[in-house]
Amino acid sequence: MELLTNFPLLSSLAAIIFAQVIKVPIQFIVSRKLDWSLVTSTGGMPSSHSAAVTALSTGVALEHGLDSSLFAVSAIFAVITMFDATGVRRHAGEQATVINKLVIDFNRFVNEAKDFPKAAEKEKQKKLKELLGHQPIEVFFGGLTGILLTLVLAYFFM
């Protein structure tokens, strides 16, 4: 089956898995807290999106050359993805932080204004996910992860 021998695809998937798994020990080193939920979460160091798109572009470059149209498409796709990770998604995460604080402050105000006996209802309120985007350094190391991992895989499998 050709899908199972598609080097750019496989290197991109390997980069996603590697970047997601490596987030756990990196966060442990920084915070001394073991958080396995990072394996399936967005945001954090390194950016798995950046690792994936740079691995894809590197794999395409190795297979088809830097002068191919396919590389041009994958490179532009990578740039847009990494720009989005540091721009729109990061700002959405910052907005989620502010909105969550507003909800907490509003609930505190309501509780102080009157005796609010519905604690169970308050606990059911959904918080917005705040870790959506990436700091530029996370995107940089995600991209570097994708490139280096693909070069290592190419050495062994191409």
Curated annotation (Swiss-Prot):
Lineage of the species this protein comes from: Bacteria, Bacillati, Bacillota, Bacilli, Bacillales
Subcellular location: Cell membrane
A single GO cellular-component term on record: plasma membrane
Keywords, comma-separated and alphabetical: Cell membrane, Membrane, Transmembrane, Transmembrane helix
Coiled coil, from the record: none
Protein name: Uncharacterized membrane protein YuiD
Taxonomic source organism: Bacillus subtilis (strain 168)
Bilayer-spanning residue ranges: 10-30, 137-157
Membrane topology of the entry: Multi-pass membrane protein
Chief location category: membrane
